[in-house]
A protein has these predicted regions:
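N-terminal signal peptide c-region/cleavage motif recognized by signal peptidases
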Residues: 16-18
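Residue-level detector of transmembrane insertion/anchoring sites
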Residues: 7-8, 147
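Bacterial N-terminal signal peptides that target proteins for export
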Residues: 1-7
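N-terminal, motif-rich segments that launch catalysis or mediate targeting to/interaction with membranes
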Residues: 20-152, 159-354
Length: 354
């Protein structure tokens, strides 16, 4: 198989940035799928009672990312109150189970008490009517719980938000057996793929040969780039946004709502879940671990290169070599995961409010 070698460049600010799973369009697509699937259901009425006039699952889907800064616009009093009450809210979006593993379980290496599985459990419990501290230690309100479920069901279907890469200095992917082994000396945390770098020009050139060209943007929707374009792209960023764009282009859709309409019309075959809905996050995490093995298939990291953050702190990054057809299987997997996320979001809300 042809290989694409991705060179390393200075990209510290990008490699060290916060992860926003699926990006704006991906999260909106998950919400839009659920909006359409829930029309006319008892759950739709319960959802409407918690949303503000004009809000939909699609429109609130990015709220938990927007509270991390002002890139969505000025923060509302509701956002500021949520951040003040949840100082570790950025940790709610992911878990870091070695991607080679098959299952998530409480206390596993890479898991945490505030990770995505535990946070989803709490939010689902709230909508089930449980408000005791054992079920809801963060004291989420029902509205916050709905917003978090809408967003985090999307996040947990992004493979790199569950399956994490741990790397030796020479670039080998390794499986730490304990948290203590991730010491930054023999075993490094690749930070959800943020410290694994693709050459942006090369991956773009490769995708141009196998992914349909983007449809012309609607008039007035183009925005200038917020930052100078980096010569490298973190693997996490590729999975957050780039593959979503590829997946939408392969379906000839331009907006999240068009994507939702197209995939629902195709009558996608989506695996269901069983048991109490509070156990479903474990099932989703296991499925995402399986997906992360596909995301890392054929991906090879080179030796570590030390860089320095804006705070003057040293850290390591690794240049990647990926299979030459990587945009094709990765965008196919992204399409599947977005569809599964939308259908599972609708299903869990129906299960809570039958």
């Amino acid at each position: 198989m042809k290989k694409l070698t991705c060179v390393l460049a200075l990209a510290g600010v990008f490699a060290a940035g916060n992860a926003l799973a699926w990006g704006n369009d991906g999260h909106r697509a998950v919400g839009a799928i659920a909006d359409q699937l829930l029309k006319g259901s008892a759950a739709q009425a319960k959802i409407a009672a918690l949303l503000l006039p004009g809000e939909t699952l699609e429109s609130i889907a990015n709220w938990p990312d927007c509270v991390k800064g002002t890139y969505c616009g000025p923060q509302s009093p509701e956002m500021l109150a949520y951040v003040a009450a949840n100082p570790r809210h950025s940790e709610y979006h992911y878990t870091d189970i070695p991607f080679q593993n098959a299952h998530y379980h409480d206390g596993a290496t890479g898991s945490a008490g505030d990770d995505i599985v535990q946070t989803l459990k709490q939010a689902i419990s709230v909508l089930q009517g449980k408000s005791d501290l054992a079920s809801n230690p963060h004291q989420f309100t029902p509205r916050q719980a709905l917003i978090l479920i809408t967003h985090l069901v999307g996040d947990i279907h992004q493979p790199l938000h569950v399956g994490a890469a741990y790397v030796a200095k020479d670039g080998r992917f390794v499986v730490p057996e304990t948290q203590a082994q991730i010491d930054g000396l023999a075993i490094f945390d690749a930070r959800g793929g943020n410290n694994l770098l693709l050459d942006d020009a090369q991956i773009t050139a490769l995708s141009d040969a196998v992914i349909p060209a983007p449809q012309p943007a609607e008039e007035g929707t183009l925005k200038p780039a917020a930052y100078p374009k980096s010569p490298t792209k973190p693997l996490h960023s590729y999975w957050d946004s780039t593959v979503v764009d590829y997946a939408m282009r392969r379906l000839s859709t331009r907006t999240p709502r068009q994507f939702a309409q197209t995939v629902i019309a195709s009558q996608s075959d989506v695996p269901g879940n069983s048991g109490d809905p509070v156990t479903w996050p474990y099932q989703w995490a296991d499925a995402s671990l399986a997906a992360s093995k596909v995301a890392y298939a054929g991906v090879v990291a080179g030796p570590a290169t030390q860089q320095t953050s804006r705070k003057g702190e040293p850290y390591y990054v690794w240049a990647l070599t990926v299979p030459g057809d990587y945009p094709v299987p990765s965008s196919s997997l992204a399409r599947t995961q977005l569809i599964n996320g939308g259908y599972h979001l609708a299903a869990v809300l129906r299960a809570i409010w039958p």
